[in-house]
Amino acid sequence: HVSIEQGKLYAQDILDYEIDEDLINSFKENDIVGGSSIFNYGEPFGRISPSTLRYVQNALDISYFFGEGDLNKIVEIGGGYGGLCKTINCLCDFGEYHIYDMEAASKLQEKYLSYFEIDGKVIHHSEPEKLQDIDLLISNYAYSELGEKLQDLYYNNIIKNSKKVYMILNKGQVSREVLLKRAEEHFDVTVEKVLDFWPPNGYL
């Protein structure tokens, strides 16, 4: 859950990007389904949920860091209710979007995303089965909340097979440093942005 105040931080960050009214309206479609708590964040957003603002900020960061052209095969570890998939699709026409999550969460994501016309195929996985040739790997908090054995499985089966990685951790600097040290074996690592919203958590 994202608080009203956290939503204000995301809204402020989003203003660094150039977005028009049509794009904002397409982002706000997220709130049509599921009875989201929406609040007035003023211009240019109007009434929008804090959770959608977080997804918008994530999607715009991904677009800024990695571009929108070469993201045909996207993987998300821990897909929430499917909101980030929907939001990214406002910016990027992907071919495949794989979501790894628990079975109950996968059913929720399928139901939510069925209300929208998503460009590309959304594929759900309830086990960390191996996947190759991933253009972009995303994890907002979920990876850092896994136990060590599951982290190993996800890293070896999925993360290291990814060309680009966008990951936010919520277990503080130790978790972040452990992951970065490991990633240096398989990636040319550059930390593009460090957001410390709620010390000592919330590192990107």
What residue spans do the PLM features occupy?
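Conserved Class I S-adenosyl-L-methionine-dependent methyltransferase catalytic core
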Residues: H1-G69
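Conserved class I S-adenosyl-L-methionine
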Residues: D70-G80
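Conserved SAM-binding loop of SAM-dependent methyltransferases across substrates and taxa
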Residues: Y81-C92
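Conserved S-adenosyl-L-methionine
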Residues: C90-Y97, S162
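S-adenosyl-L-methionine
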Residues: K111-L131
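A short SAM/SAH-binding and catalytic strip from SAM-dependent methyltransferases
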Residues: L137-K149
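A short, conserved alpha-helix within the catalytic core of class I
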Residues: L146-I158
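Conserved beta-strand signature within the Rossmann-like core of class I S-adenosyl-L-methionine
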Residues: S162-Q173
